[in-house]
Swiss-Prot record:
Keywords: Aminoacyl-tRNA synthetase, ATP-binding, Cytoplasm, Ligase, Metal-binding, Nucleotide-binding, Protein biosynthesis, Zinc. Its main location: cytoplasm. ATP binds at K269. Pfam families: DALR_2, tRNA-synt_1e. This is Cysteine--tRNA ligase. Binds 1 zinc ion per subunit. It comes from Geotalea uraniireducens (strain Rf4) (Geobacter uraniireducens). GO terms for biological process: cysteinyl-tRNA aminoacylation. It comes from the Bacteria. Belongs to the class-I aminoacyl-tRNA synthetase family. NCBIfam families: cysS. A motif ('KMSKS' region) lies at residues 266-270. Monomer.
Length: 494
């Protein structure tokens, strides 16, 4: 099965065929760095990180560009409020964005250009649009004339006349048409500016991405990504100005991730219903957040809530507990795990595990080839984990065959982990990290829990079962669940 992607431009799933065989050029709109990033930003960046990883896993050479918008009205307004230079704001939030993305396990893109470092390219592009009759100067502003670009709105499938009739747009004497958009803004007193043929000013938002993407990827490239909220006006305007300037198709495949919702409303700063990445990571492990963001298909809406994050944490724990059990099995039989498995000698449950483990890479590939369906891919992992748990619970001894099966499962999950960017932690350490984080929210310390477990073990040894039960019940009242095994007593947070 060939990789198929949903192209917003055509509204259909299409076979993904790179313009240049073996190579992929991909641009994703980055953040405007004026404030803390929220979970909507996290989703977009994790989604395209996984797409980047998957394309590379197919043996493709990927040139991945993600920009920073480091000059904008919002940046200037914040700088004025704080009484600092605009670039003090942008640099502060670039560093914070980079830290957030590193915590979420993102790979670095090939290039991360800043708008302010590409002013000459932006000015050249604006001048080209003027020379070709697609843009006009009005005072110190330069605007794009949407009526001159016939395919305008082909991405969002809107109608220009309907939009003009239905919109409540204030008359702007600097525009010939209400939907014309700014390419170059005249600087107001006290604002940062750059010299240009049209006077002192700065670039508009849309032209920045066109100039940077075409510099690093060429006039036509394979993938342009971003959130659905960018389809109009940002990506629509990018298409108009880029294709008007070059006379060539701008992008072959347009990919857009769905919104993160709270109470059925899109999470956004403008609505005031957002949670920053830092706020969420103060409460949940970064791998839990990444797991949650990949638990739905990237184009589907994703409902954000404590309950859904807790459910994601529980699901991830289930997989990691199976990985710990696998590691313990391999540790108990260290000389085995690499030999061939004789399928004909396996029992029913072992044979099911053997088959599902062996087919996992193919099933994962089929899911990802279907428009990067991480939700289905993760479902296959859960299916395999159920088989692992059944086989290990029914096993009467840690045989060589069992170790070989465990080694196969671990290797195949590892291949998937590298693409999804999850299940990459050392399993026992990850579970300890999750447990300690949960315990920190309880009104009992980890040290006290461990002390009581030691006291309970002594009580059981002395056959003081009354005291043993008292300790167990006391801890259960604190949401601490004890699990007794031959290796001792472990605990978890309910």
């Amino acid at each position: 099965m060939a990789l198929r992607v949903y192209n917003t431009l055509t509204g259909t799933k299409e076979d993904f065929v790179p313009i240049e065989p073996g190579k992929v050029k991909m641009y994703v709109c980055g953040v405007t760095v004026y404030d803390h990033c929220h979970i909507g930003h996290a989703r977009a960046n994790v989604v395209f990180d996984v797409i980047y990883r998957y394309l590379r896993s197919l043996g493709l050479e990927v040139n991945y560009v993600r920009n920073y918008t480091d000059i904008d009205d919002k940046i200037i307004n914040r700088a004025n409020r704080e009484g600092v230079a605009y670039d003090a704001i942008s640099e502060r939030f670039i560093k914070e964005f980079d830290r957030d993305m590193a915590q979420l396990g993102l790979l670095l893109p090939t290039s991360q250009p800043k708008a302010t470092e590409h002013i000459p390219e932006i000015i050249t592009l604006v001048q080209t649009l003027i020379d070709k009759g697609f843009a006009y100067q009005m005072g110190g502003d330069v605007n794009f004339c949407v009526e001159k670009f016939d395919p305008y709105l082909k991405l969002s499938k809107r109608n220009l006349e309907d939009m003009q009739a239905g919109a409540r747009i204030e008359v702007d004497e600097r525009k010939r048409h209400p939907m014309d958009f700014v390419l170059w803004k005249e600087a107001k007193p006290g604002e940062p500016f750059w010299e240009s043929p049209w006077g002192k000013g700065r670039p508009g938002w849309h032209i920045e991405c066109s100039a940077m993407s075409m510099k690093y990827l060429g006039e036509t490239f394979d993938i342009h990504g971003g959130g659905k909220d960018l389809v109009f006006p940002h990506h629509e305007n990018e298409i108009a100005q880029s294709e008007a300037a070059s006379g060539k198709p701008f992008v072959k495949y347009w990919l857009h991730n769905g919104f993160v919702n709270i109470n059925s409303e899109k999470m956004s700063k403008s609505l005031g219903n957002f949670f920053t990445i830092k706020e969420v990571l103060d409460k949940y492990d970064s791998e839990v957040l990444r797991f949650f963001l990949l638990s739905a298909h990237y184009r589907s809406p994703l409902d954000f809530s404590d309950q859904n994050l807790t459910e994601a944490e529980t699901g991830m724990e289930r997989i990691y507990k199976a990985l710990v059990a696998i590691d313990e099995t391999l540790a108990s039989n260290p000389a085995t795990g690499g030999e061939e498995i004789d399928a004909s000698s396996l029992g029913e449950a072992e044979r099911e595990l053997f088959d599902k483990s062996g087919s996992l890479p193919l099933r994962f590939r089929e899911a990802m080839d279907d428009d990067f369906n991480t939700a289905l891919a993760m479902g296959h992992i859960f299916d395999l984990v159920r088989c692992v748990n059944r086989v290990l619970s029914e096993a009467k001894e840690r045989s060589n065959t069992l170790s070989a099966l465990c080694a196969q499962v671990k290797a195949n999950i590892g291949k998937i982990a590298d693409v999804l960017g999850i299940f990459t932690s050392e399993p026992a350490s990850l579970l300890t990290r999750l447990k300690d984080r949960k315990a920190s929210e309880l009104d009992i310390s980890v040290e006290e829990i461990e002390r009581l477990i030691t006291e309970r073990a002594a009580a059981r040894k002395a056959k003081d079962f009354k005291r043993s039960d008292e300790i167990r019940d006391f801890l259960l009242g604190k949401n601490i669940v004890l699990l007794d095994s031959a290796q001792g007593t472990s605990w978890s947070v309910k």
